[in-house]
Amino acid sequence: MNVDYPMNNIPQASSLLRKNNGKRLSMASAARTSLLGNLNLNGTSGGASGRNSNIIDSSSLSMGNTGKRRSLLSTPASINRRRQSSLLQAPMSSSQMSSQSQQASQQTQAPFNQDQRPLRDKNYQTLIQQEIYDFLLANKFELEMNHPLTFKTLKQPTQKDFVVIFQFLYNKIDPYYRFTKSIETEVFLLLKILNYPYLDGINRSQISAVGGQNWPNFLGMLYWLVKLNLSVLNLNSKVDLISPDDEFDKIFINYITQSYRAFIDERDDYSEYYDEMKSRFDELNNNIIQDIENISNENNELLNQYNELNGQLDILENSEKKSKALENDLIKFKAYIETMESRKSKWSEILNKITQEIGNCEVELNNIESVKRDYEAQIGQQGLTPNDIDNLNTERDKLSKSIDLISNSLEDLKDVYHNKQINLQKNYQSLENFLKQYNNLIYKIQLKNHNYDYNFEINFRNNTIINETPDLLKPNEIINKNLKDEKIQLLNYKSIINTNVHMHQDEQIKLQEQIDLISELIMERREEIETLEAKLTANKSTYDEIYETMINDTTTYSMQIEKLERELRSIKINTNQGFIEVENKFQNIQIEYDELLYEIHSNRSILHDKIQKIIESTIGFKINIQSNLEDLENLAFDEFEKEDKKLNKN
């Protein structure tokens, strides 16, 4: 069941849902449940905290059974929380102290909840002031508190106005609470109990002077209390809690409330309420089944009607499609007839134009034939025939073709010569680069070994030899050394290097044998260490067993001690009433301690956040540098591959 509440930040305390019937709400009942809660916390079984709570001495529960409880703050959970370290309770065990310290650390390490409401906005202040003013008037603030109220009171309040309004709003939530301490302590403590989400923006010094710049924060707090009151009123109404469509939940909640009231009245027989709930369930179930049958019958009838209408709809759609097709054909025929009619009027003009063009063409043909006869007469006078003219034209075409072939072959030869020259230049350049690499390698090798005195460097005899001599050159004419002699010298030098390598390998084998001996000694030492560790683990297991038995004995003894202390505490509750004042002082000191601890943890969390931001920025800077270095490395590697490919091609 989904229930929509008006405010998400308002605490929905289960104790607020109780009916004030005046029964089983005394201080004695609260003390009894708190004692039982302590029994459960100290390790006893949970079954002892139910209806078996009557095992406690009836004399300790006789005080105030008929009176009402003083406040919602006197509920068992609150008594157990507010009197954790009082003199009326036994000292806490180690498990209790650890659990409470964890709860305190969780509470103090809660993040700072910043108020997002525009409390400094004048329009927003006017709106919430109007709502607070309307709520106070509707709930008869002036009659109950005997204090005047105007709209100006919420704009420029005095300290007394704030105190009276706060007391009125809180008493609407908890009618039995009485304000006995100073207003600074009361306001801060009550807001902390109500889980006010923006308590971090309020401190004790501001509570003593609410006017001026501090008033918007306190106005927002009063508005939150008004909304909390409205939500409590909505919780008391059944209509808001249960949706109108969910009758089963209404019946079940009615059964729960009646059973709970019987439990409050100390009656254990719930059969009457159960039978009533069962009969109402059966009646409602039968009604729902009947409604389902009626709806199914109506659904079948509607389905039949739908099928009939669907068949008629298919016939109608087919007829509409046919009519649309006929309309389209009619439109096309009309368009075709119109085009043919328009062409009829144009055919006469077209025929006249064609006849005129035929006459013009015949005149031009006669003119061309007369010109042809004139040309033939002129050629006959020169002594040439048309065949002679054709032969001359064919010879001219042959000569032009032969000239073109010769010019093309000349261009091809030029291209071949140019390509050969380019290849020769490239080969010369590659040879020059190869000699440079060879000289560099020889230089590096000779730096490492000075025993062999021979200059292996090879150079060209003349750098301009290719440009000056077009004839073919032998290898010895290009470089300054004989390659065969140079090869012999290189082989001799290689043999010297191989002998040195073998000497170093022998030395390496000797060193490896020494390393193997040392590693064997290390393995023996490790085996000894493993045996000692096995003995240590065995000793640890025996120690753990002894330690567990000792802890079990101590827990049993501590449980017996706690049981005796609880008995002693129950006696002190009835005899030592004078310790209550000391308890109240201790509670005040404890509250101040919690506040100081909360401030320390909040400052610590702020420092942790700052350190985390610094670390994140440092990591981001480092990652950026690494990515840039990787990009630079990839770029250098690509350039190296390109150069290597060029050298391999050459």
Curated annotation (Swiss-Prot):
Coiled-coil residue spans: 265-443, 510-601
GO cellular component: Ndc80 complex; nucleus
Span list, region Disordered: 43-119
Record carries keyword Cell cycle: yes
One of the GO BP terms on file: cell division
Keywords of this entry: Cell cycle, Cell division, Centromere, Chromosome, Coiled coil, Kinetochore, Mitosis, Nucleus
One Pfam family in the UniProt entry: DUF5595
Comp. bias (Polar residues): 50-65
Main location: nucleus
Compartments (UniProt record): Nucleus; Chromosome, Centromere, Kinetochore
Molecular function GO terms recorded: microtubule binding
Biased composition (Low complexity): 85-111
Organism superkingdom: Eukaryota
Family designation: Belongs to the NDC80/HEC1 family.
The protein's assembly and partners: Component of the NDC80 complex, which consists of NDC80, NUF2, SPC24 and SPC25.
Function: Acts as a component of the essential kinetochore-associated NDC80 complex, which is required for chromosome segregation and spindle checkpoint activity.
Protein name from the UniProt record: Probable kinetochore protein NDC80
Organism placement in taxonomy: Eukaryota, Fungi, Dikarya, Ascomycota, Saccharomycotina
Name of the gene encoding the protein in the UniProt record: NDC80
